[in-house]
Amino acid sequence: MTHSTDLQWLLVRQNSKFLQKRNGIRLSSDPFNNNANWTKRHAGFLNTKAAVVKTKGDRILVTTKDGKAGNKPKSMYKKAVMDAGVEASVVSKAVAAVRPDLASIASRRARKMASTLEHMKKVRAARKERSSKITFQRKAVRPKRH
């Protein structure tokens, strides 16, 4: 027997594993929540359809939950790995296929993650270049006394 999302939200609204209260602000640590708002609309664990944008290494991972196979977790989630330089509109269209109301939030998040990954790539290259120039002198080893 399945319950409506309204009933489930009433039960978990005040107390949940994903609810984090910080200075009077309610945030969410739900893995399917794109912007950490503690609202019914953004609660991915409640909704049958959800989408989230994350990073996987130096690429962007879009995971969607389509709600067709609710009792089969393996086939319920679809994952698409995209390059960091992918346009935000591609991510937006992938999310809009499942949840059109979350498309703009997902594209914003993808844009921010892509810029972060690009910055990290530049920092790594600069560190590698600096470290290749450094040569370490071997210390003179004093002979052992007998």
Curated annotation (Swiss-Prot):
The keyword Ribonucleoprotein applies. Keywords: Ribonucleoprotein, Ribosomal protein. Pfam families: Ribosomal_L28e. Residues 123-146 are annotated as: Disordered. One of its GO terms (molecular function) is structural constituent of ribosome. GO terms for cellular component: ribonucleoprotein complex; ribosome. The keyword Ribosomal protein applies. One of its GO terms (biological process) is translation. Belongs to the eukaryotic ribosomal protein eL28 family. PANTHER family: 60S RIBOSOMAL PROTEIN L28 (PTHR10544). This is Large ribosomal subunit protein eL28.
